[in-house]
């Protein structure tokens, strides 16, 4: 990939804005269609994808610490691809299935909503930084990549893990 920060900035911010807008708009859209299966299947799929991404992120950290940079690159690219698949599945779930209401009471309800709200906010905020990190690595600006990753990696890992936690709490 050739370095072109101006085009990369425009592309990354545009993709991030479009994804955010799509999630917000499509979250409110409901389509009644008989799929032949329970559309809540997508929630389970999302948890599996989130768990897989969390595992890959941990593996990616191990690989980079082991200086296995080629394997690290492949694992991180797979994490991004799975995150795109997650996004499609997430939108499908919210378009096709009714919302599930958390039925817990007391302090567990507070814990659930804290996890859910931080998960949603950090998922939305982290996307452009994940993309900028991937861009910096792809143009071999590893110092800048490493600076970004120190912030975005723990956030991305938190989002992936809490996605699974929210699924099991419901």
Labelled PLM ranges:
Residues 1-170:
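Alpha-helical membrane insertion/targeting regions
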């Amino acid at each position: 990939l050739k370095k072109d920060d101006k085009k990369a900035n425009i592309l990354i911010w545009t993709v991030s804005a479009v994804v955010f807008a799509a999630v917000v708009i499509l979250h409110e859209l409901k389509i009644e269609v008989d799929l032949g299966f329970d559309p809540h299947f997508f929630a389970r799929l999302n948890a599996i994808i989130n768990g897989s991404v969390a595992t890959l992120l941990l593996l990616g950290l191990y690989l980079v610490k082991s200086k296995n940079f080629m394997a690290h690159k492949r694992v991180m690219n797979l994490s991004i691809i799975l995150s795109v698949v997650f996004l499609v599945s997430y939108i499908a779930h919210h378009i096709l299935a009714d919302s599930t209401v958390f039925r817990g009471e007391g302090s567990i309800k507070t814990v659930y909503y804290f996890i859910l709200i931080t998960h949603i906010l950090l998922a939305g905020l982290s996307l452009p930084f994940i993309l900028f990190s991937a861009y910096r690595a792809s143009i071999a600006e590893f110092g800048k990549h490493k600076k970004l990753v120190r912030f975005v990696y723990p956030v991305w890992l938190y989002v992936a893990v809490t996605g699974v936690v929210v699924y099991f709490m419901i």
